[in-house]
């Protein structure tokens, strides 16, 4: 399908890997196919890789598009994998000339980050194995909680997420997803993101990166809401 859409006029192919909201993961064979399509068209690839270090299976290693393709650019940040969204620090990896141009453009938007933010970011990277290990252990526990809940709900289904902190749930009811989420919040003060935000009605995005007990409580409220529909 991508090959049919890309033409010599295609300047940029944007990827999100691992994917938000589904938690899907594109591994090397698929990425290499996308690179071939981009190279044939002379297109760049921009890959949002903010969840790259939160692959649930430790045996899976996903290459960077910047390593696979001479016109590949990958962005990342401390906000998701390191749970440090408040620092507003990230990075981009790509061809040297492109990164040089990026520095010039960046000077017009962000001259520098705060000294404290910079120091905290450095500390996080110095201790990345500890932080990522803790976060991955939590995610695996929470993913199991979510999977058990989906198995127990006959009107809910999902493709099991392989990475990241979100999953995309399909529900079997005529109620549109925006109304579903508004009513759920009004009734139970529980937040889900409507699938219409991702052009998919009757789907819901759930974030599961927090205390397992709290996740179970929230999912229980969704069950109660489903029962009264």
Model region roles, listed by residue range:
Residues 14-15, 45-47, 76, 192-194:
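Hydrophobic residues in well-ordered beta-strands that form the structural core
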Residues 122, 138-147, 158-171:
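Conserved glycine-rich beta-strand-loop-beta hairpin in the small C-terminal domain of fold type I
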Residues 1-9, 21-44, 49-84, 97:
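Active-site pre-lysine segment of PLP-dependent enzymes
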Residues 40-41, 153, 188, 229:
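Helix C-cap/helix->beta junction micro-motif
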Residues 93, 168-170, 207-209:
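Short hydrophobic/aromatic beta-strand micro-patches
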Residues 3, 174-175, 182-192, 198-229:
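PLP-dependent enzyme catalytic core of the Aspartate aminotransferase-like
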Residues 74, 154-158, 190-195:
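A short linear hydrophobic-aromatic micro-motif
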Residues 68-140, 147-149, 220:
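Conserved core segment of the aminotransferase class I/II
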